C-alpha cells in the first residue's frame, strides 16, 4: 500500500529545515504531519489520540524555538510521536514500540531532541525547572518548555514544581495542553486577541512599570491595585490559580490554530523574566474522524484500517487477567457490601470499569494520584471497609512511602491488586512490573502473592477479600490467561502455603507467578533427558511456605526458583531462608532465575523473557549447568590435565 503524499514534510526532516519554511506553509505541513502519523500508527499500533491533538502545537514549538538548544519536555510522552517525526526520526517511525525500534515515549538515548525521558506522568515541570535553573547558573539564555496535559495536572507533583518555580521566579514556560476542556474553553477571536495582548512585551512592560509606581503608594492602595489587575485579567482569561503559584498566565487559546499559537509563543520566547503558563485547548484525535468520535478507544490502539478505523484484535485464547480480576471482584462484592475499589485514573486498564458498572457507588477514581489513592484506601480500611486499591506495578512505585507509612506500619488491611506484573512488551522499561515483589516483601507483616494462572487469580481475589489481618497484595501480568477451567467463585487459600503441581525426584522447579507454564514445559524436557523433575507453585513470596521449601531441598539435588521480577524478590527470600535454616550446608545446588539486572528495552514479551532466560529453554539450560551437563543433557566429562 502506497504512503500518503507529503511534499512539505519531505522538505522538513529536522527542525532547522522546518524553521526555514514560511509561516503560510505551516498549516499544510501540519496536515501532512497528521496524515503521516495516522498512516504510521496504523501499521504499528500505539498512542494515537494524544499525538493527533498536538500536531499544530508541535509544529509551532519547533518553528518558534531553537531546538535542540531550547529544551522541549513532553510530559508522559504519549503525545510525542509528531515530535519524533519532525526531529529526524521519520525514517524509523514505523518501528515504533517494536524490538530494536523507536520507543513509544521520549528517550534521552534516542535523540538530542529528547532532553528528558518520560512515560510516567507529571514529571515535566520538575525536570524543566531543574533545566531552567541549570541554564541560569551556566549563564545561558536557553528556553525550557514543559508540555503537560490537564490529566497530569491531577498529580500533586505538578503543583509542587509550579510552587517552587514561582518562588524561584525561574524563566520557565509551561504549556498546559487542555484536551478534555476541563478548565475553560477558548472563546474565539476575543480570546486569541487577549492571549496575544497579555503575552506581549508592551503589556508586560506597562504592567511592570505600574508595579513600580504602585510600590510608592500606601500599602492598602498597593493591594487594591494588584487585586484590580488580577480580577480584570481573571475575568477575561482565567488562570487565577496559576497566578497564585507565581506564574504569568496566558490563555486559553485554540491549540489547533497556528495564527493564534505562533504570536503567543514568540511573545513568550522573547520574555526575559519569570515563569509563564500558556493554556492551550486541543482535541484528542483531531483530524481523524474515528478518533474524534471515540477518543477513549483511540488513546492506545492496535494496528488499524485507516479508511474504516477498525482495529485489529488478535484472537484471545482465554479471558485476560485484567478481566478475570474485575469479574472476580464483582462476585466477591455481591457477598460483601464492605468491598470497595480504588483506581488512580486507570479504571479500564485495571478492570475496575467492570466493577464500576456493577457497583457505581463503590468505585473511586482519584485521578493520577497514586500517593493519595493508597492513603485514601488506608482511610477506608481504618473504618472497616475492604478497599481493593488496583494499581499497575510500575505506578505503585509512585505511592511507596504511603504503602509503608500509612498502610504497613499501621497494619491496615488494604488489598493491592497489582496489574502489569513482569514484562509488558511494547511499553518497555518504564512500564515493566519488575520491582513490586521486592519492595513489598521487604515490609513486615505484608502478605505477597502471585497468580500462576487465571484460576489462581480468582482464588487470590477471594483470599484477599476474606483476609483482615493486615495488608495483602497479589500480582498478575498483562494479557490473556492460559485457558484453565475457572471456578464460578474462588476458594480461600491458606496463607503462606504453596502447592506441588508435578512430582519428581532429582530436580525441583519452584515458580512464583505465571512462569509456571514454562516450568512445566521445562520439566517435560528435563524428564526426557532422564532428570525427574518436581514443579511447585509457591503462591506466596511472603510468608514463605517453609515446609514446602524444606521438602524440595531435602528430596532433590537441584532447586531452581523462577520469578518474573528483579533480583531481590522471591528468590532472594527463599535463599535467605535456606541459608538461615542450614539447608545449604550440605552442598545443595540452588539457582535463582530473575529478570536481568538491566532495564530491558521494548519488544515482544515472549522474546524478552527468552532473552532473560525465563523461558523453558533458559530453565533447562540452568538445570544442566547446575548438574554439569552439556546442552543435550549428557554429563560433561572433566577436562583432561595437560602438562
From Swiss-Prot:
Gene name tied to this protein: dxs
Species of provenance: Brucella melitensis biotype 2 (strain ATCC 23457)
The reaction(s) this protein catalyses: D-glyceraldehyde 3-phosphate + pyruvate + H(+) = 1-deoxy-D-xylulose 5-phosphate + CO2
Cofactor notes: Binds 1 Mg(2+) ion per subunit. Binds 1 thiamine pyrophosphate per subunit.
Residues that, per the record, bind Mg(2+): 150, 179
Protein keywords: Isoprene biosynthesis, Magnesium, Metal-binding, Thiamine biosynthesis, Thiamine pyrophosphate, Transferase
InterPro entries xrefs: Dxylulose-5-P_synthase, THDP-binding, Transketo_C/PFOR_II, Transketolase-like_Pyr-bd, Transketolase_BS, Transketolase_C, Transketolase_CS
Function: Catalyzes the acyloin condensation reaction between C atoms 2 and 3 of pyruvate and glyceraldehyde 3-phosphate to yield 1-deoxy-D-xylulose-5-phosphate (DXP).
Pfam families membership: DXP_synthase_N, Transket_pyr, Transketolase_C
Disulfide bonds: none
Presence of keyword Transferase: yes
Cross-referenced Gene3D superfamilies: 3.40.50.920, 3.40.50.970
Name used for this protein in its record: 1-deoxy-D-xylulose-5-phosphate synthase
GO biological process, one term: thiamine biosynthetic process
Amino acid at each position: 500500500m502506497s504512503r500518503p503524499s507529503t511534499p512539505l514534510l519531505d522538505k522538513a526532516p529536522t527542525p532547522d529545515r522546518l524553521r526555514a519554511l514560511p509561516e503560510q506553509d505551516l498549516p499544510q505541513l501540519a496536515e501532512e504531519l497528521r496524515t503521516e502519523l495516522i498512516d504510521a500508527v496504523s501499521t504499528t499500533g500505539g498512542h494515537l489520540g494524544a499525538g493527533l491533538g498536538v500536531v499544530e502545537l508541535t509544529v509551532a514549538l519547533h518553528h518558534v524555538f531553537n531546538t535542540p538548544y531550547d529544551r522541549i519536555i513532553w510530559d508522559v510522552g504519549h503525545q510525542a510521536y509528531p515530535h519524533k517525526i519532525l526531529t529526524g526520526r521519520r525514517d524509523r517511525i514505523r518501528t515504533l514500540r517494536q524490538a530494536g525500534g523507536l520507543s513509544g515515549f521520549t528517550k534521552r538515548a534516542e535523540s538530542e531532541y529528547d532532553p528528558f525521558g518520560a512515560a510516567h506522568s507529571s514529571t515535566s515541570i520538575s525536570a524543566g525547572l531543574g533545566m531552567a535553573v541549570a541554564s541560569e547558573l551556566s549563564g545561558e539564555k536557553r528556553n525550557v518548555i514543559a508540555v503537560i496535559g490537564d490529566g497530569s495536572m491531577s498529580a500533586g507533583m505538578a503543583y509542587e514544581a509550579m510552587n517552587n518555580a514561582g518562588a524561584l521566579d525561574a524563566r520557565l514556560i509551561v504549556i498546559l495542553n487542555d484536551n478534555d476542556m476541563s478548565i475553560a474553553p477558548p472563546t474565539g477571536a476575543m480570546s486569541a486577541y487577549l492571549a496575544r495582548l497579555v503575552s506581549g512585551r508592551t503589556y508586560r512592560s506597562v504592567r511592570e512599570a505600574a508595579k513600580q509606581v504602585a510600590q510608592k503608594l500606601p500599602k492598602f492602595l498597593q493591594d487594591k491595585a494588584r487585586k484590580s489587575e488580577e480580577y480584570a485579567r481573571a475575568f477575561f482569561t482565567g488562570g487565577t490559580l496559576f497566578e497564585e503559584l507565581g506564574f504569568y498566565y496566558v490563555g486559553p487559546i485554540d491549540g489547533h490554530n497556528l495564527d493564534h499559537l505562533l504570536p503567543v509563543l514568540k511573545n513568550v520566547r522573547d520574555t526575559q523574566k519569570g515563569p509563564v503558563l500558556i493554556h492551550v485547548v486541543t482535541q484528542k484525535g483531531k483530524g481523524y474522524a474515528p478518533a474524534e468520535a471515540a477518543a477513549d478507544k483511540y488513546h492506545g490502539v492496535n494496528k488499524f484500517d485507516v479508511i474504516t478505523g477498525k482495529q485489529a484484535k488478535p484472537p484471545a485464547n482465554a479471558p485476560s487477567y485484567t478481566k478475570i480480576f474485575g469479574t472476580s471482584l464483582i462476585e466477591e462484592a455481591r457477598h460483601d457490601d464492605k468491598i470497595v475499589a480504588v483506581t488512580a485514573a486507570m479504571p479500564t486498564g485495571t478492570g475496575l470499569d467492570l466493577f464500576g458498572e456493577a457497583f457505581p457507588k463503590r468505585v473511586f477514581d482519584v485521578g493520577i494520584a497514586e500517593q493519595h489513592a493508597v492513603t485514601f484506601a488506608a482511610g477506608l480500611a481504618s473504618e472497616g471497609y475492604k478497599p481493593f486499591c488496583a494499581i499497575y506495578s510500575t505506578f505503585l512505585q509512585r505511592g511507596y512511602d504511603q504503602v509503608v507509612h500509612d498502610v504497613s506500619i499501621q497494619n491496615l488491611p488494604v488489598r493491592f491488586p497489582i496489574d502489569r506484573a513482569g514484562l509488558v512488551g511494547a511499553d518497555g522499561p518504564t512500564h515493566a512490573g519488575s520491582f513490586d515483589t521486592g519492595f513489598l516483601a521487604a515490609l513486615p507483616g505484608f502478605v505477597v502473592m502471585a497468580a500462576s494462572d487465571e484460576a489462581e487469580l480468582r482464588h487470590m481475589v477471594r483470599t484477599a477479600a476474606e483476609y483482615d489481618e493486615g495488608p495483602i497484595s497479589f500480582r498478575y501480568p498483562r494479557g490473556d490467561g492460559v485457558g484453565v477451567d475457572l471456578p464460578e467463585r474462588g476458594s480461600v487459600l491458606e496463607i503462606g502455603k504453596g502447592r506441588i503441581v508435578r512430582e519428581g525426584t532429582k530436580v525441583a522447579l519452584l515458580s512464583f507467578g505465571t512462569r509456571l507454564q514454562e516450568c512445566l514445559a521445562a520439566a517435560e524436557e528435563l524428564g526426557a533427558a532422564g532428570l525427574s523433575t518436581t514443579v511447585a507453585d509457591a503462591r506466596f513470596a511472603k510468608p514463605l511456605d517453609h515446609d514446602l521449601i524444606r521438602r524440595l531441598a531435602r528430596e532433590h539435588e537441584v532447586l531452581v526458583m523462577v520469578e518474573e521480577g528483579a533480583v531481590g524478590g522471591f528468590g532472594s527470600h527463599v535463599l535467605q531462608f535456606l541459608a538461615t535454616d542450614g539447608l545449604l550446608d550440605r552442598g545443595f545446588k540452588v539457582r535463582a532465575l530473575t529478570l536481568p539486572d538491566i532495564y530491558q528495552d521494548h519488544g515482544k514479551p515472549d522474546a524478552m523473557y527468552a532473552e532473560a532466560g525465563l523461558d523453558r529453554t533458559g530453565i533447562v539450560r540452568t538445570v544442566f549447568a547446575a548438574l554439569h551437563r552439556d546442552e543435550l543433557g549428557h554429563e560433561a566429562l572433566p577436562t583432561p590435565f595437560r602438562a
